[in-house]
From Swiss-Prot:
GO terms for molecular function: ATP binding; ATP-dependent protein folding chaperone; unfolded protein binding. Induction: By stress conditions e.g. heat shock. Residues 649-662 have a biased composition (Basic and acidic residues). It comes from the Bacteria. Gene3D superfamilies: 3.30.420.40, Actin, Chain A, domain 4 (3.90.640.10), Substrate Binding Domain Of DNAk, Chain A, domain 1 (2.60.34.10). Coiled coil: none annotated. Acts as a chaperone. This is Chaperone protein dnaK1. The modification Phosphothreonine is found at T198. HAMAP family: DnaK. NCBIfam families: PRK00290.1, PRK13410.1, prok_dnaK. Keywords: ATP-binding, Chaperone, Nucleotide-binding, Phosphoprotein, Stress response.
Amino acid sequence: MGRIVGIDLGTTNSVVAVLEAGRPHVIANAEGGRTTPSVVGYSKDQELLVGQLARRQLVLSPRNTFSNLKRFVGRDWEELEDSSLAVPYTVRANDRGQVRVPCPVTEREYAPEELVASIIRKLVDDASTYLGESVEAAVVTVPAYFNDAQRQATRDAGRLAGIAVERILNEPTAAALAYGFDRSAVRRVLVFDLGGGTFDVSLLRIANGVFDVKATNGDTQLGGNDFDQRIVDWIADAFQAEHGVDLRRDRQALQRLTEAAEKAKQELSGVLTTPISLPFIATGENGPLHVETNLDRSTFEGLCPDLLDRLLMPVQSALRDSGWAADDIDDVVLVGGATRMPMVQQLVRTLVPLDPCQSVNPDEVVAIGAAVQAGILTGELRDLLLNDVTPLSLGLETVGGLMRVLIPRNTPIPVRQSDVFSTSEPNQSSVEIHVWQGERQMASDNKSLGRFRLSGIPPAPRGVPQVQVAFDIDANGLLQVSATDRTTGRKQSVSIQGGSNLNEDEVTALLAEAEARADEDRRKRNQIERRNRAQTLVAQAERRLRDAALELGPYGAERQQRAVEMAMRDVQDCLAQDDLQELDLCLSGLEEALFGLNRRLSAERQSDGRPLQGLRNTLGSLKDELFADDWDDDPWAAPSGPPRGRSLNRRDRDPWDDDFYR
């Protein structure tokens, strides 16, 4: 198996890591950062921007720049909460009730999976550049409480990015792998994962390389962004009360508010009060309006009591499902940047009387764990075993709309479970299998994953035919359902694919489009790299000319200097005219001219290291040109040089001087 990387696909930031020499480490992106903003955008020229480049245009072009995409992956429009829709760009439903994100500059609508695929593609490209080889597979992490639909959609995003998703891994489990993969002692670990847009808690038992997940719980619509939104609303409400202007109705103002709120939240983790300054954020009747205020930690915490309550309940549920008490926990691992908030850490301490582990970086630990899982898959790590669980119950709809659970939540995976059902009407020739996921008693209150029909059942009284329904969950947490008529042996099976906002034809079309776009992207990248190389070489040439003037004087290597200047002008002309075909030839000429100048400088340094030699050369050249007949003595001449009052003859010249052979 080839190289597999680990990807933490986050709501706010994403990270890629790899296992090398048995140790996992994070790969820096092309911009030098260890985390990549999970932001995708399009410039006014319709150029795709991902990561930091996209984040830079959030304020200037909020309708064409998309963040928090993870909250939309694998979800139908009717499932979205109002807090998820509080974004500066437009989110709407198509005629099938699926989420779509319009982009005005490209005049297209995108499924969330398409945009997320661009993030995955960048992470993989950066990893390929670092490793010096193509990366075609990855372990991708998802929140533990992601349902089957969201997991399928994440896998589709990987397909659109052109990689094979070898394993879908729960984020808290990945964090535990990173924390305990080199520990041999038996530990009971609580992983508290509060990211930008999702929250998970998992309880694991770690012993001698075996990781047993005992219980998991969470909230896929709760994260650090919700805390940011409380600050946004606090500022906007105060501004509206004072000036009568609702900043949330202006896309650019809303984006500025969001960035200021995130910054204030981060700063309040280390200080008790922080200033918030947003000049010229709006215009009133009397001129520009500004935001100038201070936010202290106690006020911030007073804005979020209900959010803390929502963090409390999943932890209590996970402890109850595992059968553990809080005192049974040996270690607490905090994951996600939002866990740096003091009020969150204090909440965890009230639940589990332990100081959280500080040996892991909460922003990177999930990607490191994904890299460990990649090492397990490739066989690089042979002494580790991971036993995960399914986060939500799986079942089907029975008579009266009831939910019949076949696989309860927190069942270890992979797993196969089956049960026998019958017909509800006499002479019924077919049955519909409707698969649901969730914890509610009524099927319609849960998440519908898909349905299919088993036909060809022989006529019989009600309750006589026997239909065996089997659920299979693989190690990725993905579901396959089959139904078999025991009388005829007729069988119907289906891999649940209803989670994605794209059908198979759309995925195929997008893959073809992505390949065509990849060729264009490579061409654009090549053009940019050639221009950057040219600009770098011109800057280098300018430095070498200054060095030559200082060391040799303006006439010490006149021919080489003129050659560099002419070649440099040719390159600058090509850049100005955007003539990239001629640029390569001009670059070769500049490199050749620089080689000649560098050789001349090197020879001069080797032959004479005396100080002020450049100044002596300059004054000597000026004297020869202007005062050769008037000066009898040259105060700057070297004692061992040729006779005063005349220039060097062929015998006296430096044999390394190219002018010698003219």
